[in-house]
Amino acid sequence: MERIVNQSEMQEDFNSELSLRPQKINEYIGQDKVKERLDIFIKAAKNRKEALDHTLLYGPPGLGKTTLANIIAKEMGGDLKITSGPAIERAGELAAILTTLKDYDVLFIDEIHRLNRNVEEILYPAMEDYALDIVIGKGATAKSIRIDLPKFTLIGATTRIGMLTSPLRDRFGVLCAMEYYTDEELKEIVSRSALVFGCAITEEGALEIAKRSRGTPRIANRLLKRVRDYSEVKSNKLVSLKEAREALELLEVDNQGFDKVDNKILEAIIDNFNGGPVGIETLSYFIGEELGTIEDVYEPYLLQKGFIIRTPRGRIASDKAYEHLGRVNNSKSKSNNGKVQGSFFDK
């Protein structure tokens, strides 16, 4: 069973996200700095009758990268073509996609850091010169043919900008860092989504869902649907603070947006390893989760919120973790004042 607080897209998200997506940049909630920059760049490109510079959107999953790509395509008057790094296995597949584009179209490549290197090299002339270099024949008879491409915009999305090669990263003219949303921004998103769903909700109910959504609109909309279900069965269909709290407690999503596995990790570090440090492999074995799952799924948000600290010797529980679980920290010297080390997006 998938986690309801999983930031990555789940099957149930696909259709609902389509209906909830804003169509214009001024309808997009949150990411104010990103919106302001993109609005200026889009207007400037349209005034010059040029395509928008190739754009890289990076940050945690679920923050609206695909939605922004769709908005950019609409603002530029082009179509949006969506694919992903893992889906393009051969250079010919990417070439086929590129040759179907028209002027001002947007090609959106999700997880662009996972592109095959041979495929990636096809992008270099496409991004720099709007051209595609194709080699025909083999050996001494081989010759290169250049095919002109339309003036399109490539939008790459990644959760790990540090994994992009320098040649690819340097070819993006616009780089936008997507940040976690505030509770107030998420409350606005929840209220808007409730209107689309035909669900009555109070401000307090919307804020309670927002607070437990891990700064992520995708999770907020997912929780809203489950709270709506609870309210329709258990009460008068109005999602109030009471219904929101009861539904979220039933879903085992606490007031920090943590689920039972998040709390299990914190409990293991504090109760079984005296607050740490504990090696990630030992922690993985102890809680029964794969090492990669802990590093990629659970740990990033706990690090970002400052509940655990990553050190060369292992993971340490911060003062916030002790407070959250109602424990007394008898080894505060280990907590390094609760500061999070490093950036987990650049691993």
Curated annotation (Swiss-Prot):
Annotated segments matching region Head domain (RuvB-H): 255-347
Binding annotation for Mg(2+): 66
Cellular component, GO annotation: cytoplasm; Holliday junction resolvase complex
CDD domains: AAA
Keyword presence, DNA-binding: yes
Binding-site residues, DNA: 310, 315
Source organism superkingdom: Bacteria
Transmembrane regions: none
A family per Pfam: RuvB_C
Region (Small ATPAse domain (RuvB-S)): 182-252
Main location class: cytoplasm
Function: The RuvA-RuvB-RuvC complex processes Holliday junction (HJ) DNA during genetic recombination and DNA repair, while the RuvA-RuvB complex plays an important role in the rescue of blocked DNA replication forks via replication fork reversal (RFR). RuvA specifically binds to HJ cruciform DNA, conferring on it an open structure. The RuvB hexamer acts as an ATP-dependent pump, pulling dsDNA into and through the RuvAB complex. RuvB forms 2 homohexamers on either side of HJ DNA bound by 1 or 2 RuvA tetramers; 4 subunits per hexamer contact DNA at a time.
NCBIfam families attached to this UniProt entry: PRK00080.1, ruvB
Protein name stated in the entry: Holliday junction branch migration complex subunit RuvB
Organism whose genome encodes this protein: Clostridium beijerinckii (strain ATCC 51743 / NCIMB 8052) (Clostridium acetobutylicum)
Name of the encoding gene: ruvB
